[in-house]
Curated annotation (Swiss-Prot):
This is Bifunctional homocysteine S-methyltransferase/5,10-methylenetetrahydrofolate reductase. The lineage of its organism: Bacteria, Bacillati, Bacillota, Bacilli, Bacillales. Zn(2+) binds at residues 200, 265-266. Keywords: Amino-acid biosynthesis, FAD, Flavoprotein, Metal-binding, Methionine biosynthesis, Methyltransferase, NAD, NADP, Oxidoreductase, S-adenosyl-L-methionine, Transferase, Zinc. PROSITE patterns: HCY. One of its GO terms (biological process) is methylation. It comes from Bacillus subtilis (strain 168).
Length: 612
């Protein structure tokens, strides 16, 4: 009798965690490598689960794929690890079924690996496992539904063996993209999975609640592998705590929800499996139940903007935004005075960097809130991935929405090692691509875990563009990728060459997404030499450097020459781009205010010529 035939007549018990037990033995390295170096340890765990009552065990191959093994420098051992894993499981299984296990790759950082890379890695491991002839496949811990669907298509095409696919939830009842669990399971069932279910992250209580909203499907079986509990940290080690009796009672509840396979994930041990086997092992499955209707959480629609987005302005006419760095010291008067000068000059928005060059400054959110409150100015608030983890970024976005600061620029952020505190941690939980997606998901009223936020935000998302690279075409490809992620417009690094401006226009003119081209006035010869020699990718022409050097130490001459160079660049930029991004050096708002006036005068002259 095969696995699927067995499931027709009884509830089967899966095994529990492998990593938890190895970790408890003091092993804290690549667990899959133990298939080669310490096979007796893996066999001991398999046997313990079989003796506890498991009808199904899974091979120790969750991370035995190219992507995960390469993190340990073990990618050359992938074949032997998978081969040995199936042999060890077979030798331990007795009458239990052996499933070849393959784990998900994607987490929140969807851009860490492309879908093509994931599929190549999956396909290689799949062939290795199938060659060893397991009784079926277990694809588990898939947080990303797109990834789950794609790898399932590959597996279903290559084998007729039973396939179990378990997705994982950060929040009860929904996947991280907001897809209800019931819909997600139905979609993978339609792609050919024989058993669909959930594992990891959540304990029994939340999984029971989640399954109460899932019907008992006629064409596939249901599986559940809960964590034992939420983990706690004791003396630097993760510890899970759950009473075996609790798991015994939970197993009965899982059966009532229609589960045919009940096992355990992180934190579970043979004791948990024994408790569940005693409770429901071998019992007839439940075939009918009352499905709880998922409560629809009210998500209020965001208020419509009373002003057009910066992308909308730049798509139709001239738009000028000006960067003004928040102060490094606890003195706000000079900053506020500079902001007022720029408002008087008629800019569309003030852009506020997020601890630029990894240097601590007054919070740009505080600056944005104050200039809005005191000057009624619009702010484009930069958000870096460097300083905040996933929790902090979401809290940050919620705060911005609460303050009504709806214009944001999503950037990676300069690494901490270049700033005042080179030993500080650079977080980078997300890339700028992921951050753009996250902000757009907030606009749909969903957090990163898929949990409803109660309202939709109304963020307009800018993305960074660095044209100061050797291969401009590759930089443009990154722009296209950011557009796919949801970027509404771009803000560029400063440009110091008329020809470069022309090249940028030619390479980007096919894009419908507006670009604000960056222009930053030089303040001295020393400033010019610093930019030329120390800022990656930016090279000033000999002519520009000579002009700034010729100005000497005379501050008025330095200012005049710096403005003259900027005006020359603006003459070209304004012909090619509607959006102009002026970067204020050293809080010298007089420079960017004067350049703003210059742009406005040029536009007025052009308009007069057009009218006449």
């Amino acid at each position: 009798m095969g696995l699927l035939e067995d499931l027709q007549r009884q509830v089967l018990i899966g095994d529990g965690a492998m990593g938890t037990l190895l970790y408890s033995y003091g092993i804290d390295r690549c667990f899959e490598e133990l298939n080669i170096s310490k096979p007796e340890e893996i066999q001991r765990i398999h046997k313990a689960y079989v003796e506890a009552g498991a009808n199904i065990i899974q091979t120790n191959t969750y991370g035995a794929n190219y992507i995960k093994l390469s993190r340990h420098g073990l990618e050359d051992d992938i074949k032997k690890m998978n081969q040995e894993a199936v042999k060890i499981a077979r030798a331990s299984a007795g009458d239990a079924y052996v499933l070849g296990t393959m784990g998900g790759i994607r987490t929140f950082n969807k851009n860490a690996y492309s879908l093509d890379e994931i599929k190549r890695s999956f396909r290689e491991q799949l062939y290795l496992l199938l060659h060893e002839e397991p009784d079926g496949l277990l694809l588990e811990t898939y947080y990303d539904l797109e990834e789950a669907r794609e790898v399932l298509k590959i597996a279903r095409k290559e084998t007729d063996l039973p396939i179990m696919l378990n997705v994982s939830m950060h929040e009860q009842g929904v996947l991280q993209d907001g897809t209800p669990l019931s819909d997600a399971l139905r979609s993978i069932a339609d792609l050919g999975a024989d058993i669909v279910g959930i594992n990891c992250r959540l304990g029994p209580y939340h999984m029971i609640e989640a399954l109460s909203e899932v019907p008992i499907f006629d064409d596939v079986f249901l599986s559940v592998y809960p964590n034992s509990s939420l983990p706690s940290l004791e003396e630097g080690r993760l510890v899970y705590e759950t009473d075996d009796t609790y798991f015994q009672n939970s197993a009965s509840e899982f059966r009532k929800q229609g589960a045919r396979i009940i096992g355990g994930c992180c934190g579970t041990t043979p004791n948990h499996i024994r408790a569940m086997a005693e409770a429901v092992g071998g019992l007839a499955p439940i075939t009918e139940k009352e499905v709880k209707t998922r409560a629809k959480e009210f998500i209020s629609v965001h208020h419509e903007r009373t002003e057009p987005g910066l992308d909308e302005i730049a798509a139709k006419k001239r738009s000028i935004i000006v960067e003004l760095d928040p102060p490094k010291k606890l003195s706000f008067d000079k900053f506020l005075s500079a902001a007022a000068e720029l408002k008087e000059a008629g800019i569309d928005a003030l852009t506020l960097a997020d601890n630029s060059l990894a240097t601590p400054r007054i919070s740009n959110v505080a600056c944005g809130a104050l200039v809005k409150q005191q000057l009624d100015m619009r702010s484009l608030v930069h958000i870096t991935c460097r300083d905040r983890n996933i929790i902090g970024l979401q809290s940050h976005l919620m705060g911005l929405d609460t303050l009504g600061l709806n214009d944001v620029l999503a950037i990676t952020g300069d690494p901490s090692k270049i700033g005042d505190f080179p030993g500080a941690t650079s977080v980078y939980d997300l890339t700028s691509f992921d951050l753009i997606r996250l902000i757009k998901q907030f606009n749909e009223g969903l957090s990163l875990s898929g949990k409803p936020l109660g309202k939709k935000t109304n963020f307009s998302v800018a993305a960074a563009f660095n044209p100061n690279v050797r291969h401009l075409d590759k930089a443009v490809k990154r722009l296209e990728k950011k557009i796919d992620c949801g970027a509404d417009y771009f803000v560029s690094q400063p440009v110091y060459s008329e020809q470069q401006l022309v090249d940028i226009h030619n390479e980007t003119k096919h894009l419908k997404t507006p670009i604000y081209i960056g222009i930053m006035p030089l303040t001295s010869s020393r400033n010019a030499e610093f930019i030329h020699n120390e800022i990656p990718g930016i090279k000033l022409s000999d002519t520009i450097r000579e002009k700034m050097a010729h100005a000497g130490e005379d501050k008025e001459k330095q200012k005049a020459e710096g403005l003259a160079i900027a005006r020359s660049l603006l003459d070209t930029a304004c012909e090619l781009f509607n959006g102009i991004y002026l970067i204020t050096p050293f809080l010298r708002s007089d420079l960017t205010a004067e350049l703003t006036s210059y742009i406005q005068q040029k536009d007025e002259q052009r308009q007069n010529i057009f009218l006449h």
